[in-house]
Amino acid sequence: MVRFTSVLALLILTLSLPALAADAEPVAPKDMDGITLYKTYCKVCHTADSEHGEYTPMDLIMDQWDEVFDAMDESHAEAKLETTDGESVPAFLGGKLLDRIRKFCVDHAADSEEPMTCG
């Protein structure tokens, strides 16, 4: 009976976690890590069926990611998201946020020790 109760309690907890997360306050960009910033601000445009092409960290090697981010101001000058209130993506993300995304992409590039697709 104890085992059944434990399993039932675990099942109830597992099923209630998504509801708890839905009630959570949204995370401000300044509090996001690199992967969350990437999923929130990059992945929305860079999908498989996008005219901009799909990109995940392991699609490029580290040096290529550095080149992408070095050219970000120019290449994304016209890129705007609904969440940026009309600011270009580079202007909205600015220094520290863009640095976190860059670090995430470089750290998980194809030639890194931990390549990642970012799901």
Segment roles from a protein language model:
Residues 1-5:
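Positively charged n-region of N-terminal signal peptides that target proteins for export
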Residues 7-16:
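Bacterial N-terminal signal peptides
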Residues 18-37:
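Electrostatic cytochrome c docking/interface patches
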Residues 38-49, 101:
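The canonical Cys-X-X-Cys-His
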Residues 39, 62, 66-74, 98, ...:
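An amphipathic alpha-helix signature
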Residues 47-80:
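N-terminal, post-signal-peptide region of Sec/Tat-exported proteins
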Residues 56-57, 62, 67, 84-99:
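Electron-transfer interface patches adjacent to heme c in soluble/periplasmic c-type cytochromes
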Residues 87-119:
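C-terminal capping alpha-helices of c-type cytochrome domains
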